[in-house]
Amino acid sequence: MREKKEEDLQQVLNKVSEVGIDEVGRGAVFGPVFSAVVVLTEKNKFILKQFGVKDSKKLTPKKRKLLLPKILLLSSDYGIGQSSAREIDMLGIRVATELSMIRALKKLKEKPSEIIVDGPLLLRPWKGIQKNIVSGDSKITAIASASIVAKVARDNLMERLEKKYSGYLIFKNKGYGTREHFSNIKKNGITNLHRKSFLNQSDLI
């Protein structure tokens, strides 16, 4: 009887508990929007909590990079997707963000029976069951994990792009519209990776 209970407990702990999805870079003026999805069992969800996984915005870049390999190792599956600045300008940020999420979900080996999406907006193209959790990256471990995966992936891209777009301090601002970034846009002009739909005329003159 005891062995049966222990076996049942292990089955519960190893069962997929959460499939969380989140995006980063939605408000930036340069570069793509990234999304990530992370699949966790009940057991590994608890372990990642113990490691300190939480909303990526509340972690230092160093801590996010330290947590990333742990998340990838302990996740049952994960996927990363992105939508380019051009797609954002053509489709609008909401549709482009949804597209990046769908691309991330398509990287999974199996279609999940249910996903948990960060924020209040439905992922409209998704045909399966979904839940929306406002501030989900602070409440749901799989979403917090996804936010870290997406954030590190996007930050790594920004670091690589710094070499080509050195006049915009992309490494420092990560593509967001800081005063310094706008000053450099006025000085150097806009690039093919700037989101033109996010820039006002006053930002360019």
Curated annotation (Swiss-Prot):
Q: Which GO terms describe its molecular function?
A: manganese ion binding; RNA binding; RNA-DNA hybrid ribonuclease activity
Kindly report, in one word, the top-level EC class recorded for this enzyme: hydrolase
Describe how the cofactor binds. Answer: Manganese or magnesium. Binds 1 divalent metal ion per monomer in the absence of substrate. May bind a second metal ion after substrate binding.
Where does this protein hold a divalent metal cation? D22, E23, D118
Q: Biological process GO terms, please?
A: DNA replication, removal of RNA primer; mismatch repair
The record's section on CDD domains has:
RNase_HII_bacteria_HII_like
Give the record's keywords alphabetically.
Cytoplasm, Endonuclease, Hydrolase, Manganese, Metal-binding, Nuclease
Q: Which GO terms describe its cellular component?
A: cytoplasm; ribonuclease H2 complex
Reactions performed catalytically: Endonucleolytic cleavage to 5'-phosphomonoester
Q: Which PROSITE patterns match?
A: RNASE_H_2 (PS51975)
State the Gene3D superfamilies in the record: Ribonuclease H-like superfamily/Ribonuclease H
Occurrences of domain RNase H type-2 (ranges): 16-205
Q: What is its main location?
A: cytoplasm
Looking at the record's lineage, which domain of life comes first? Bacteria
Under the heading Pfam families, the entry gives: RNase_HII
The protein's required cofactor(s) are namely: Mn(2+); Mg(2+)
Where in the cell is the protein located? Answer: Cytoplasm
* Annotated EC: 3.1.26.4
Q: What does this protein do?
A: Endonuclease that specifically degrades the RNA of RNA-DNA hybrids.
Q: What's the family?
A: Belongs to the RNase HII family.
What is the name attached to this protein's record?
A: Ribonuclease HII
> Gene encoding this chain?
rnhB
